[in-house]
């Protein structure tokens, strides 16, 4: 039987998936050892061109999206590797306030979201993959650690509005074994046919839309599609989606400029470059 989510009354937490800018400093040592190449080779990271030395690059075959690009998002029943972030209080779930996705990693325990989503949460959040209509078909996973870039910690840099989250194991199995995972795309072209998934605040189901991304600025992506209000922050920009699994390569998350956009019809993301790669390596090393 799939667990049903019972919300706690008056749970504290972020008032919005795209809150007003607030500086946040993750209280951990900024320095971290880099993970070895042999360990990182176990994780699939998609690059625009093969890396010379360092981390091994692996490529996936592009899979067609099927339907044509759209201008408006539509609700759907969800997909296993994308879910909602919930506040927690005294062991009970509160409301969902942002979106996250499972990303491939050697330990199978990392999520990807926007850094502004975890401002002030102090780790009191949980992830519900595939959440829809009050159900948790792939269990509830507590977030145990948060990893953000020092540039974000220091000044809330819009180009570093990215966070990796470590989740605790449930019954010994890592989350990736349960849900599958998206691949992490680094340095990919800004113009891609892209599927974006997000959980609007208070909505029983996620929304999905696909359209062409474009470069808004040298370090920011733009995605034009309606239906992405507060709560969709952290939602993945997915390309090369496999219709059989619903999984693909994530090249961005709703965030960055205007913390993802002041209008529900236009969403933004920081482009994933060397900064995101370094943050991922650090998260893998410490998770």
PLM regions: where:
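Protease-domain processing segments flanking chymotrypsin-fold serine proteases, especially trypsin-like
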Residues: 2-105, 278-287
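Conserved catalytic-core segment of clan PA serine endopeptidases
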Residues: 68-80, 87-89, 104, 125-172
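Catalytic histidine site
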Residues: 75-132, 212-217, 225, 269
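Loop/turn elements at helix/coil->beta-strand transitions in domains of secreted/extracellular proteins
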Residues: 80-82, 107-109, 190-194, 219, ...
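Acidic glycine-/aspartate-rich tracts in secreted/extracellular proteins
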Residues: 117-118, 131-134, 169-172, 201-202, ...
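Chymotrypsin/trypsin-fold serine protease catalytic domain
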Residues: 143, 158-231
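Catalytic nucleophile loop of clan PA
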Residues: 227-253
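C-terminal cap/linker of serine protease catalytic domains
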Residues: 251, 257-287
